[in-house]
């Protein structure tokens, strides 16, 4: 699921900051579709929900592709209210795609579900709390027990 397509389809909910679709061609390759969803103007405590359609009740492995840059912050995640396995540090000396980042495996019911990103801080060398979201993938991982 392209994050920028979710924004274009009004499938996001934001509490803190704004989002825009950002072309990434000027930063080299590696972004799916050549764009990302750029989240700016947020601070610690801001939340961005990506609303996704889950086709069937099942366990799903959830993977997200993000961006790193000198002015990006740290994110934590929830999938349908369940905490993700790790936080993501977006700070980097150069703008670059993160590659796949595993949020964990989650039991999800069919229908609209939220993948939530929360700004939780930043490195001392980062100049901001920005975030870039490229895409999200859900892989079936077994029946709900």
Predicted feature descriptions by range:
Residues 1-145:
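Extracytoplasmic
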């Amino acid at each position: 699921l392209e994050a920028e397509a979710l924004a274009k389809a009004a499938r996001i909910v934001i509490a803190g900051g704004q989002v825009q679709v950002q072309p990434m061609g000027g930063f080299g390759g590696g972004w799916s579709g050549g764009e990302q969803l750029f989240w700016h103007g947020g601070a610690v405590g801001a939340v961005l929900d990506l609303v996704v359609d889950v086709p069937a009740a099942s366990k799903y492995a959830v993977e997200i592709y993000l961006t790193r840059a000198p002015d990006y912050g740290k994110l934590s995640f929830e999938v349908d209210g369940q905490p993700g396995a790790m936080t993501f540090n977006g700070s980097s000396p150069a703008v670059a795609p993160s590659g796949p980042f595993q949020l964990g495996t989650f039991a999800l019911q069919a229908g609209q579900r939220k993948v939530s990103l929360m700004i939780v801080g930043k490195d001392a060398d980062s100049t901001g709390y920005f975030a870039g979201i490229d895409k999200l993938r859900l892989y079936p991982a077994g029946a709900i027990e």
